[in-house]
């Protein structure tokens, strides 16, 4: 089976993008270089094609019960047009994925829309339908990933850029709020969300309107690929599913991964009982700044200054904004305090590092 492609794939080819495989999708890694794209988002605005993210619609009388059982946050708190971040956990409280859940506006299809990570939409659909059927819930579940496209417009200029094409209502959206808005004649779900640490929106639209939406925005800002998306999210300390946690290779609970804020025990989600006594985990997700030359990479050991292994790097890069090496990973809780001196073992040599609570930037 070949790689899946975005409804904007032809636009990216015409623009000369370089491509990479990610989660079973063939997606742009960059258009004009990661450094330039990263800087554009930090200083002005950039547009990302994120159509590789899944979209699952849930509706029906028991839609809220189903969402409440399978995501860790409390969807009953959401009014139409509200969104929240959540984890999806198994019976043992291990994170399968993380997601954003929308209680959709009244004029958007479905009661809920949630966004699994790239390549996870089929598994999420199966999990939702299996649970629905096992518990005899009256809800419809539809994998609409191929029916929609999705872009993220991020950066300090992004809200004004989108508002100029969609109306000033974009400025009225609070954080994690969404509304149905017309962009270039296409009805879109526009949400005040993002994965860069900057102001901006994410826009969901019918796949057949993808080109019109992209052209209306991309002609006036920097197209960006997955390379810059990765360096931007690392500077802010955001998790990447499959990289910073994985149910098979790197099983973590939400409390280990630093997203206990997205856990609502009263919601009765799958895995709640297993998590009841784990809100003080043995290891914690932390940021690292390297004090010597080198770059922390996935899988590198984190040690004490004396050389005792206390954790592992899960993500790392040379920060384009800071010009310094940064990393994310897990260390024993006794060594997780901000400012703690540790080391990262790079090719057999322990390089001094400092535990640094993300975000790494002063914003």
Curated annotation (Swiss-Prot):
Its EC number is 2.1.2.10. It catalyses: N(6)-[(R)-S(8)-aminomethyldihydrolipoyl]-L-lysyl-[protein] + (6S)-5,6,7,8-tetrahydrofolate = N(6)-[(R)-dihydrolipoyl]-L-lysyl-[protein] + (6R)-5,10-methylene-5,6,7,8-tetrahydrofolate + NH4(+). GO terms for biological process: glycine decarboxylation via glycine cleavage system. GO terms for cellular component: glycine cleavage complex. The keyword Transferase applies. Keywords: Aminotransferase, Transferase. GO terms for molecular function: aminomethyltransferase activity; transaminase activity. Gene3D superfamilies: Probable tRNA modification gtpase trme, domain 1 (3.30.1360.120). The glycine cleavage system catalyzes the degradation of glycine. NCBIfam families: gcvT (TIGR00528), PRK00389.1 (NF001567). The glycine cleavage system is composed of four proteins: P, T, L and H. Belongs to the GcvT family. This is Probable aminomethyltransferase. It comes from Halobacterium salinarum (strain ATCC 700922 / JCM 11081 / NRC-1).
């Amino acid at each position: 089976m070949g790689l899946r492609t975005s409804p904007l794939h032809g636009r990216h080819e015409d623009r000369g993008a370089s491509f990479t495989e990610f989660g079973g999708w063939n997606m742009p890694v960059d258009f004009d270089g990661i450094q330039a794209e990263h800087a554009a988002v930090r200083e002005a605005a950039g547009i990302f094609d994120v159509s590789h993210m899944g979209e699952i619609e849930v509706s029906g009388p028991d839609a809220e019960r189903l969402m409440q059982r399978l995501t860790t946050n409390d969807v009953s708190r959401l009014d139409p047009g509200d969104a929240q971040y959540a984890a999806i956990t198994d019976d043992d409280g291990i994170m399968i994925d993380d997601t954003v859940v929308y209680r959709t506006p009244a004029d958007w299809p479905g009661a809920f829309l949630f966004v699994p990570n790239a390549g996870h939409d089929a598994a999420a659909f199966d999990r939702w339908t299996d649970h629905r059927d096992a518990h005899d819930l009256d809800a419809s579940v539809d994998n609409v990933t191929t029916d929609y496209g999705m872009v993220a417009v991020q950066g300090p200029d992004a809200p004004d850029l989108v508002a100029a094409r969609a109306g000033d209502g974009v400025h009225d959206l609070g954080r994690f709020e969404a509304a149905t808005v017309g962009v270039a004649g296409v009805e879109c779900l526009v949400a005040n969300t993002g994965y860069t640490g900057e102001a901006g929106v994410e826009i969901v639209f019918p796949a057949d309107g993808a080109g019109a939406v992209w052209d209306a925005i991309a002609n006036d800002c920097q197209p960006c690929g997955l390379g810059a998306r990765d360096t931007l999210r690392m500077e802010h300390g955001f998790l990447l599913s499959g990289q910073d946690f994985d149910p098979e290779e790197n099983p973590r609970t939400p409390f280990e991964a630093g997203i206990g804020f997205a856990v609502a025990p009263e919601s009765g989600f799958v895995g709640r009982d297993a998590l009841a006594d784990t809100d003080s985990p043995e290891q914690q997700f932390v940021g690292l700044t390297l004090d010597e030359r080198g770059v922390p990479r996935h899988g590198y050991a984190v040690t004490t200054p004396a050389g005792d292994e206390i954790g592992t790097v899960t993500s790392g890069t040379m920060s384009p904004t800071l010009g310094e090496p940064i990393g994310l990973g897990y260390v024993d809780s006794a060594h997780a305090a901000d400012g703690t001196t540790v080391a990262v073992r790079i090719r057999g040599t322990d390089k001094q590092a400092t535990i640094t609570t993300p975000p790494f930037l002063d914003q």
